[in-house]
Amino acid sequence: MQQQQQQQQQQQQQQQQQQQQQQQQQQQQQQQQQQQQQQQQQQQQQQQQQQQQQQQQQQQQQQQQQQQQQQQQQQQQQQQ
């Protein structure tokens, strides 16, 4: 009887060790996910800045076109 009881106790200890290992793996996975999220946020910010710059350039081009049109009108008046 005594021998059988000892064997059962050893098996239970082994099971506990396995559970601990699984918990450690889960923690590592969570850390990796957090890092990925941070990287994505940084990329989004950069993209927004680039878009703003492009919009400013377009506005400048439009202003230049308007100036050219005014010059053409003045020339026509002089010819008349």
UniProtKB/Swiss-Prot annotation:
Any one GO cellular component localisation term in the record: nucleus
Q: Is Nucleus given among the entry's keywords?
A: yes
The entry's localization annotation reads: Nucleus
Which domain of life does the UniProt lineage start with? Eukaryota
Could you list this entry's UniProt keywords, alphabetically sorted.
Neurodegeneration, Nucleus, Spinocerebellar ataxia
Leftover remarks: It is unknown whether this protein exists in non-SCA8 individuals.
Disease (UniProt): Spinocerebellar ataxia 8: Spinocerebellar ataxia is a clinically and genetically heterogeneous group of cerebellar disorders. Patients show progressive incoordination of gait and often poor coordination of hands, speech and eye movements, due to degeneration of the cerebellum with variable involvement of the brainstem and spinal cord. SCA8 is an autosomal dominant cerebellar ataxia (ADCA). It is caused by expansion of a CAG repeat in ATXN8, which is translated into a nearly pure polyglutamine protein which forms 1C2-positive inclusions in Purkinje cells and other neurons.
Could you identify this protein by its name?
Ataxin-8
- Native species of this protein? Homo sapiens
